[in-house]
């Protein structure tokens, strides 16, 4: 098996209220009347689709989490159909594919790992163009938010990682 770790190249958190953070955290969820949605982009190397065993997004916790008792813990992740930029806001969000979503979520002490095998395979097979992913809370009617390191975090150990595990290939593909 070969494991490839790809660090996030771009990230963005948007909210229905102006954010005061300096791109150090991805925030996902809702607190009172404030909703947070985050975006990530990874520049993928050419990986043959038939060699991908699994792919997972590893997010590193950075601090404050607010999870009320009724908050559904699942994070919803979907592949983007359009690009995001620093001009993205709640009024002009990129479209995403609602049918394609993440797999299992594993909660650790310092990180959260989310299965993205279906999404990464769709990119590798050319079914979708990699324009990034959107992260939001599955149940926005409940209160709760999570904070993770972003692509712009000063601490490199907190940057989001896309980990792709491949079968060994007789030919190099990197």
For each feature predicted by the language model, list its residue ranges:
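Proprotein-processing/basic-patch segments
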Residues: 2-9, 22-24, 29-34, 125-174
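Residue-level detector of buried hydrophobic side-chain packing
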Residues: 42, 55-57, 77, 114, ...
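Beta-strand-rich interaction/scaffold domains
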Residues: 66-129
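Short loop/turn segments at connectors of secondary-structure elements within structured domains
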Residues: 51-53, 71, 129, 158
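Core residues of folded domains in eukaryotic genome-function proteins
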Residues: 38, 110, 158-160
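Acidic glycine-/aspartate-rich tracts in secreted/extracellular proteins
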Residues: 62-64, 82-85, 138-141, 168
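A short beta-strand-loop element at or near the start of a globular domain
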Residues: 12-64
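Conserved catalytic loop of SAM-dependent methyltransferase domains
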Residues: 7-14, 115
């Amino acid at each position: 098996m070969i494991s490839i770790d790809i660090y996030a190249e771009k990230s963005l958190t948007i909210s229905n209220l102006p954010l005061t953070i300096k791109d150090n955290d991805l925030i996902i969820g809702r607190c009172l009347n404030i909703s947070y949605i985050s975006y990530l982009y990874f520049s993928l190397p050419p990986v043959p689709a038939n060699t991908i065993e699994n792919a997972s997004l590893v997010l590193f916790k950075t601090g404050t989490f607010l999870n009320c008792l009724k908050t559904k813990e699942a994070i919803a992740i979907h592949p983007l159909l359009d690009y995001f930029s620093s001009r993205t806001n709640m009024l002009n969000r990129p479209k995403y594919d609602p049918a394609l979503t993440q797999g299992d979520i594993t909660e650790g002490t310092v990180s959260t790992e989310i299965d993205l095998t279906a999404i990464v395979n769709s990119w590798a097979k050319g079914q979708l163009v990699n324009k990034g992913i959107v992260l939001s809370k599955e149940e926005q009617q409940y209160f709760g938010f999570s904070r993770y390191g972003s692509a712009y975090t000063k601490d490199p150990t907190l940057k989001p990682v896309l980990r792709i595990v491949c079968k060994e290939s007789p030919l190099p593909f990197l």
